[in-house]
C-alpha cells in the first residue's frame, strides 16, 4: 500500500495543484515500525536456520515456535496468543505481511505516535488470536495479519472521525486506499483457502474501536493525551481478558479433547476417559470426542460402555466413517462378526484405498469361517500396503484354515519380517 499526503491548499488559502509529499519527508524515523518488521523477520530467519522449511513449515514446527492452537492457547499456554503474531507460515506469508506492516506502520507511527502504535498493534494482534480461537479452535494459526488489519482499522476511524492536527482532506486518498485494502482482503479471506479470516476480523474490529476513540485525543496536549490513552488501553485490556475468558469457557473443551487423545495414545485409558467425559459433557454432539471415548473403553475392554458411547455418536451422524470403524472394532471384540463384516464391507466400498479397512474386513470374514473371502480381503489390503504385517498374519491364518500350508508358512514368515506376531501355535 502506497501512502502519501495530499496538500489541498496553498499558504495563501487558495486551492493548489494536487501534489504528493512522500511520507518519509514529513515524519520522523519510524523506529517502532522498523523494530516490529525486524522482530518478525528475525523470528523467521531463526526458524529457517534451525532447519525449518522456508516455504512449508509443518504443524509440529509451528507449534514448537509458538503458533496459536486452541488446545494449547486455551490451556496452560496463553502466551501463544501473542507469540503467534510474530510467526509466519513461509516466506510468501511473511513478505506480504511485512510489506503491509511497513506501509501501515509508518503512517500509524506518524499519526498516533510510537508507543501508541505498539499498543494498538499488540491489542489488535491479541484480538485477532482470540477471534481465531472462537471460530476455529482446532486450527493452527500464525501471522501478523490480525495486528495489521487492526492498524488499518485504527487509521480508518481516526482519519474519518478523529480530531486531526492536519488538514483532513490531505489524507482522503489514503483513506480510500485503506478502505479498499480492508474490504478486498476480507473478501479474499472469505473465499480463499487456508486464510484465517477470523483473525482479520478480530484485529480489524479492535482497531476500528481504538482508532475511533484515540482519534479524538490527537489534538490534545501531550500530558492530557497520554492520560486518556492509558485509560483507553486499560479498557482494551479488560475487554481482551473478558473475551479470552468467554472463549475459554465456550471452546475450552478442546483442551480436554487433546489431553484425552494424547493419554489414549500413551495407553492410559483411565486418564483419557476422565478428560473425554469432560469434553462430551460440554459438547454432546462432538463426535471426535465420542469416538475417542469409545476407543478408550475398548482399550479397557469395557464393551458395554464402548457400545453405548459409539451408538450416541452414530445417532449424531450415521455416516461418520470413524464412528462406523470403531463400532466395527467393538463388534469384532465381542465376536459379533456379521455386523462387523457389514460395517467394514461398506467402509471398503466407500474408501477402497484404505488397507486397514480391508484388513479388518478380512478379520471379520475369518471370524465367520469364510476363509477364502477373508484371504481375498487380506490380499487387497496387501496390494495397497505391502508392509502391513498384520494383514500378512491374517492371510497366513486364512491359508492355514484352508489347508494351504506352504502359502500359510510364507505369509507368517513375511509377517515376522515386518515385525508382526509370529504364527499362532
Language model features: what each stretch is:
Residues 2-265:
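A detector for small-residue-rich transmembrane helices and their helix-helix packing motifs
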Residues 264, 298, 325, 332, ...:
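Position-specific recognition of the canonical hydrophobic site in helix A of tetratricopeptide repeat
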Residues 282, 316, 350, 384, ...:
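Structural marker of alpha-solenoid helical repeat scaffolds
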Residues 253, 287-288, 321-322, 355-356, ...:
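Helix-start (N-cap) detector for alpha-helical repeat units in TPR-like alpha-solenoids
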Amino acid at each position: 500500500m502506497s501512502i502519501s499526503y495530499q496538500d489541498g491548499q496553498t499558504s495563501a488559502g487558495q486551492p493548489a495543484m494536487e501534489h504528493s509529499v512522500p511520507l518519509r519527508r514529513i515524519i520522523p524515523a519510524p523506529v517502532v515500525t522498523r523494530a516490529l518488521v525486524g522482530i518478525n523477520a528475525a523470528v523467521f530467519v531463526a526458524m529457517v536456520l534451525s532447519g525449518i522449511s522456508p516455504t512449508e513449515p509443518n504443524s509440529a514446527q509451528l507449534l514448537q515456535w509458538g503458533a496459536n492452537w486452541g488446545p494449547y492457547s486455551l490451556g496452560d499456554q496463553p502466551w501463544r496468543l501473542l507469540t503467534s503474531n510474530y510467526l509466519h507460515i513461509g516466506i510468501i506469508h511473511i513478505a506480504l505481511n511485512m510489506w503491509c506492516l511497513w506501509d501501515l506502520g509508518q503512517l500509524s507511527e506518524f499519526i498516533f505516535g510510537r508507543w501508541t502504535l505498539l499498543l494498538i498493534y499488540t491489542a489488535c494482534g491479541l484480538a485477532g488470536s482470540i477471534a481465531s480461537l472462537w471460530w476455529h479452535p482446532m486450527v493452527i494459526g500464525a501471522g501478523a495479519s490480525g495486528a495489521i488489519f487492526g492498524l488499518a482499522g485504527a487509521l480508518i476511524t481516526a482519519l474519518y472521525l478523529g480530531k486531526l492536527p492536519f488538514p483532513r482532506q490531505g489524507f482522503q486518498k489514503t483513506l480510500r486506499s485503506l478502505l479498499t485494502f480492508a474490504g478486498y482482503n476480507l473478501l479474499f479471506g472469505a473465499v480463499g483457502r487456508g486464510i484465517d479470516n477470523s483473525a482479520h476480523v478480530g484485529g480489524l474490529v479492535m482497531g476500528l474501536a481504538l482508532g475511533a476513540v484515540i482519534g479524538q485525543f490527537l489534538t490534545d496536549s501531550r500530558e492530557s493525551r497520554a492520560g486518556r490513552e492509558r485509560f483507553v488501553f486499560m479498557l482494551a485490556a479488560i475487554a481482551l481478558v473478558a473475551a479470552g475468558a468467554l472463549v475459554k469457557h465456550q471452546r475450552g473443551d478442546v483442551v480436554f479433547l487433546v489431553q484425552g487423545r494424547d493419554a489414549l495414545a500413551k495407553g492410559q485409558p483411565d486418564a483419557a476417559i476422565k478428560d473425554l467425559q469432560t469434553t462430551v459433557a460440554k459438547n454432546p454432539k462432538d463426535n471426535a470426542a465420542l469416538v475417542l471415548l469409545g476407543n478408550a473403553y475398548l482399550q479397557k475392554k469395557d464393551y458395554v460402555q464402548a457400545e453405548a458411547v459409539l451408538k450416541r455418536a452414530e445417532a449424531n451422524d450415521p455416516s461418520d466413517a470413524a464412528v462406523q470403524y470403531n463400532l466395527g472394532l467393538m463388534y469384532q471384540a465381542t465376536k459379533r462378526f456379521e455386523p462387523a463384516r457389514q460395517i467394514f464391507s461398506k467402509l471398503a466400498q466407500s474408501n477402497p484405498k484404505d488397507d486397514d479397512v480391508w484388513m479388518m474386513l478380512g478379520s471379520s470374514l475369518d471370524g465367520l469361517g469364510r476363509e477364502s473371502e477373508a484371504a481375498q480381503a487380506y490380499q487387497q489390503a496387501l496390494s495397497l500396503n505391502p508392509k502391513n504385517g498384520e494383514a500378512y498374519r491374517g492371510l497366513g491364518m486364512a491359508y492355514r484354515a484352508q489347508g494351504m500350508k506352504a502359502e500359510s508358512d510364507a505369509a507368517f514368515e513375511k509377517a515376522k519380517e515386518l515385525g508382526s506376531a509370529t504364527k499362532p501355535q
